[in-house]
Swiss-Prot record:
Protein name: CTD nuclear envelope phosphatase 1
Main location: membrane
Compartments reported by the entry: Membrane; Cytoplasm, Perinuclear region
Disulfide partners: none
Organism per entry: Xenopus tropicalis (Western clawed frog)
Gene name for this UniProt entry: ctdnep1
GO biological process per UniProt: cell differentiation; nervous system development; nuclear envelope organization; positive regulation of triglyceride biosynthetic process
Amino acid sequence: MMRTPGLLGLRGFVAFAAKLWSFVLYLLRRQVRTIIQYQTVRYDVLPLSPASRNRLSQVKRKVLVLDLDETLIHSHHDGVLRPTVRPGTPPDFILKVVIDKHPVRFFVHKRPHVDFFLEVVSQWYELVVFTASMEIYGSAVADKLDNNRGVLRRRFYRQHCTLELGSYIKDLSVVHSDLSSVVILDNSPGAYRSHPDNAIPIKSWFSDPSDTALLNLLPMLDALRFTADVRSVLSRNLHQHRLW
């Protein structure tokens, strides 16, 4: 069957239009991500009243343990583009590490508002990174998030976890002996199964640019630092933990 020049021209135009539309969508996604990630966000840290200052002086400074993957960031490596990451979404940074003598690139996406979150909570808590990832990767991610601020100096990795039935369990006693002062923020309930009364659950994050989960936690974290024992409050959140 002969193809007429008109038909060939129409198909060429349709193919060009499809590519153009894909490019426009890519630019729009990138612009929306930039606007949301870097928009001005405020959480007013008001001066403490004399009563609040007195209360804070009577309790120990708390420790906030932070998970990395799907809590503060999401990443994928060479050749593995997870369906949760929208095609064309640019990473916030790229890490180059060597694993088992093989160079690997990780494309890392930061959860919306993570920089602002770290800036605020570092004024209230001693921050600790605790990830089940390998140290060579987790350390590089933590360095990027810290950005020379010195707020993520203490770090624990896979070798500090306990392996049970194929899952890595985080023992908070290696972070601090007094668990009344320790809070862990982690998207995986299985990771803190030994310490559910110390945990704040957070939804796993992969690519949603409109996510505000970190911002939503600021009022709770602000109030929690005044408690004598964080477990007296967090033990009431057990219904929010999706069991492992």
